[in-house]
Amino acid sequence: MSLNIGVIGTGAIGQDHIRRCSKVLQGSRIVAVTDINRESATKVIRDLGIEANVYADGYEVINAKEVEAVLVTSWGPSHEEFVLAAVAAGKYVFCEKPLAVTAEGCKRIVEAEAAQGKRLVQVGFMRPYDQGYRALKDVITSGKIGEPLMLHCAHRNPRVGDNYTTSMAITDTLIHEIDVLRWLLDDDYVSVQVVFPRKAKHAKTHLRDPQVVLFETAKGTRIDVEIFVNCQYGYDIQCEVVGDSGIAKLPEPSSVLLRSEARLSNEILTDWKDRFIDAYDVELQAFINDVLAEKLTGPSAWDGFAAAVTADACIAAQESGQIVPIRLPQRPDFYDK
């Protein structure tokens, strides 16, 4: 049995997902595509040798009879309208981040989904599908290190483009930690503070880099996340969990241990795509399997909403220098079904 998928947006990530669904993953078939540049959509399916209909816009893809599930990989500000349309049509939808560009937009999606009476939306947070993070969560859940007391984390990029801003350290970079750490701890944030150390010499004039983000959770766990997007040396993700009776650390990506020229060394990756490439495959395969089973289990619209509310608080903390409360409403029981 195959799931017939329609794709809205054939840019870089859209092309990657089309390739995955048609060449790598099991149980899926791309049957419809659209892009603001129709020629781009046509070229993608031609180059991949796919027989799919090219539609004028996302609404036509959503309402096409042959489409059973939708992938939204278009421009970020268009995500909300297409997700809402898919939910209204009663179709499962996988939406790359952001779910919406505002917390209010995410809330509208949560409300629309709840009105349908079943989960229809999955958000494209891929780190919960990374083998290393899953192993780390297994250790935490097992109780081997006791209750988590502190987390020390880092998200480092070698460099960023000239258009990267201080707030993008939250919305484009930290957003992944915001989601995955909630998932790791099964806990919500209650406050955040952002501290700016001495500025890195490679940071552009308009960018404050690095940053240290300090969270407190509802259960009292303290989290510090270093965001350093001009570290120069590579793409480096770190996460160390300090518990009552032990410490668990996110494993490093597998690489050859090299002994050469009087040195012992491991390679450090430089591209985020290489670091999480397998997680993207696992994530989308899980979505396909869940839709065929008619029960989504991945990151939900509520997770997207929680991430947006938290990101807004982080930006407020950047601007004020104060500890900012993070106020999430009660999660609907709908998401516990």
Swiss-Prot record:
Q: Tell me which InterPro entries the record gives.
A: Gfo-Idh-MocA_inositol_DH, Gfo/Idh/MocA-like_OxRdtase_C, Gfo/Idh/MocA-like_OxRdtase_N, MI/DCI_dehydrogenase, NAD(P)-bd_dom_sf
EC number(s) on file: 1.1.1.18
Keywords for the protein's UniProt record, in alphabetical order: NAD, Oxidoreductase
| Cross-referenced SUPFAM superfamilies | Glyceraldehyde-3-phosphate dehydrogenase-like, C-terminal domain, NAD(P)-binding Rossmann-fold domains
Q: Name one Pfam family in it.
A: GFO_IDH_MocA_C
Name a single GO biological process.
inositol catabolic process
Function recorded in the entry: Involved in the oxidation of myo-inositol (MI) to 2-keto-myo-inositol (2KMI or 2-inosose).
Q: How does it assemble?
A: Homotetramer.
Q: Which PANTHER family match?
A: INOSITOL 2-DEHYDROGENASE (PTHR43593:SF1), PTHR43593
Name recorded for this polypeptide: Inositol 2-dehydrogenase
